[in-house]
A protein has these predicted regions:
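Ferredoxin-like iron-sulfur electron-transfer modules
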Residues: 27, 31-34, 55-78, 89-108
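Short beta-strand-centered segment that lines the nucleotide-binding/catalytic pocket of NTP-utilizing
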Residues: 36-51, 125-130
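Walker A (P-loop) phosphate-binding motif
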Residues: 2-32
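Flexible beta-alpha connector loops of hexameric P-loop NTPases
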Residues: 145-154, 208
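Conserved catalytic-core segment of NTP-binding enzymes
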Residues: 118, 125-130, 155, 159-258
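Hydrophobic alpha-helical segments and helix pairs
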Residues: 105-143
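Iron-sulfur cluster-binding cysteine motifs and their immediate structural context
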Residues: 81-101, 111-126
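C-terminal lobe/tail of nucleotide-utilizing enzymes
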Residues: 2, 220-306
């Protein structure tokens, strides 16, 4: 079942623990159930766990290299040009001395390597993380993981996007739909994935903190000029659903659907079997199952899928 080109849906949210991965995995599964070719990309590189909800394993591990300048002391003229032009101040230069690299500040931009008049900088690299690719239950997964102690998470996300673009260049019609599962927050990792998406689905919850963080992610989405609709997860929490939905309506925030508390969702999460996978035998009349089905139908209409 093919569409003209793959639609890219970004599942995101302003805070951790709202159910982004839960929604991303189950939405991917529902498209898979209907014969669509689906790619799920886990862009929460500091805590990738989509594969856990699918009871799968990380496979096909590939290192992600990151540029680091190596200064050749025998060639360096001690001019200080590299330090003067380093935007992240990663090269410490004291008059008539060899610049000292502070690797934790280096952005990997390679400017120092390109402008050195003495060719005294060699390109060196360190591993900042890994990518994985696997197939689980006819679902394609691309996963990024940041190496512990490393801070350049955006470098892993950029590598995921690069891998995606290379795949689409080779096989433009390989996938019908691509789903991003982002990190929580409204930082550069999230911005990179939202910018590559056709539509965005922020996940929130009916609490004051949920509302506050939803506002932050919507501000970023609007800045990037993307269309979005919200999913309210745990909508029956604290009996605040009606008031919360009314507040969203007052602010002209469109809602794709809401998901109430349901023990089947908890069970599926714990055993690593998605609620909406037709082979897992969960109750089709359960509150969570019905809610996800409603969200899926609304999403297909939004995407103009037949």
């Amino acid at each position: 079942m093919k569409t003209k080109k793959p639609k890219i849906v970004c599942i995101t949210g302003g805070k951790g623990g709202t159910g982004k991965t839960l929604c991303a995995v189950n939405i991917a599964i529902m498209f898979k159930n209907e014969g669509y070719n689906v790619l799920l990309i886990d862009g929460d590189v500091e805590n990738p766990n989509t594969y856990l909800l699918l009871n799968g394993k990380l496979e096909n591990k590939i290192e992600v290299p990151f540029f680091m300048p190596q200064i050749l002391e025998d060639r360096c003229s001690k001019c200080g040009l590299c330090s003067q032009n380093c935007a992240s101040h990663a090269l410490l230069y004291i008059d008539d001395s060899i610049p000292i690299l502070m690797s934790s500040l280096c952005s990997g931009c390679k400017l120092c390597y390109k402008i050195c008049p003495e060719n005294a900088i060699n390109p060196d690299f360190k591993t900042i993380g890994w990518t994985y690719s696997t197939e689980i239950s006819d679902l394609s997964l691309l996963i990024g993981e940041l190496k512990p102690s490393e801070a350049r998470s955006a470098g892993i996300v950029e590598k995921l996007i690069e891998n995606l673009e290379n795949d689409l260049q080779k096989e433009p019609n390989k996938f019908d739909i691509i789903i991003f599962d982002t990190a929580p927050g409204a930082h550069c990792d999230v911005e990179l994935l939202i910018d590559k998406s056709d539509i965005v689905i922020p996940i929130t919850e009916p609490t004051r903190f949920g509302k506050l963080d939803l506002g932050r992610i919507i501000e970023l989405i609007n800045l990037l000029k993307k269309d979005y609709k919200v999913i309210v997860n745990r909508s029956s929490l604290l009996g605040y659903k009606d008031q919360f939905l009314a507040e969203l309506q007052e602010e002209n925030i469109k809602v794709l659907g809401d998901i109430p508390m349901d023990s089947d969702i908890v069970d599926s999460y714990c055993i690593g079997k998605p609620l909406m996978d037709k082979e897992n035998g969960f109750n089709n009349n359960g509150a969570g199952f019905i809610a996800f089905t409603h969200i899926y139908e609304n999403l297909k209409k939004w995407l103009e899928f037949n």
